Amino acid sequence: MTMTDPIADMLTRLRNANQAYHDRVTMPYSKIKANIAEVLKSEGYISTWLVEEPEESAVGKRLVVELKYGQSRERSLAGIKRVSKPGLRVYAKSGELPRVLGGLGVAIISTSQGLLTDRQARKRSVGGEVLAFVW
């Protein structure tokens, strides 16, 4: 069965695992998901991520994301929201890039220079597709 929106699936898996205080979450691998995981890691929302090669019975590669919690299990990932969807794409020019919670959160932008945060895209003066908000 094909998935209509694999990015939304990834974000939902992360949100659900975070709400249930799971230490790790696995999902089907793709390059865009690995790039999103790298952005989340660089911004401090997750501990680490890795790619598991398939076993003999498995179908394809898996992306494993290690979630990050504070000293008394406070969530570092308070919220995550998909913005641009397959049915309604959302694009923003460099001067119109959204700020998430007044700069406390991060918008993940798909640009011609790869996936960037809203701050990085503003600094490089590039716009693109607004994939998600994370706070």
From Swiss-Prot:
UniProt protein name: Small ribosomal subunit protein uS8
Q: Which InterPro entries match?
A: Ribosomal_uS8, Ribosomal_uS8_CS, Ribosomal_uS8_sf
PROSITE patterns linked to this entry? RIBOSOMAL_S8
GO BP terms: translation
Family, per the entry?
A: Belongs to the universal ribosomal protein uS8 family.
Keywords from UniProt, A to Z, are: Ribonucleoprotein, Ribosomal protein, RNA-binding, rRNA-binding
Record keyword Membrane present: no
As one GO molecular function, the record gives: structural constituent of ribosome
Name the Gene3D superfamilies on file: 3.30.1370.30, 3.30.1490.10
Question: How does it associate, per the subunit comment?
Answer: Part of the 30S ribosomal subunit. Contacts proteins S5 and S12.
Biological role: One of the primary rRNA binding proteins, it binds directly to 16S rRNA central domain where it helps coordinate assembly of the platform of the 30S subunit.
Disulphide bonds in the chain: none
What species was this sequence derived from?
Answer: Salinispora tropica (strain ATCC BAA-916 / DSM 44818 / JCM 13857 / NBRC 105044 / CNB-440)
What phylogenetic lineage does the species belong to? Bacteria, Bacillati, Actinomycetota, Actinomycetes, Micromonosporales
Q: Which Pfam families match?
A: Ribosomal_S8 (PF00410)
Q: Name one GO cellular component term.
A: ribonucleoprotein complex
Quick check: keyword RNA-binding in the entry? Answer: yes
Q: Where are the transmembrane segments?
A: none
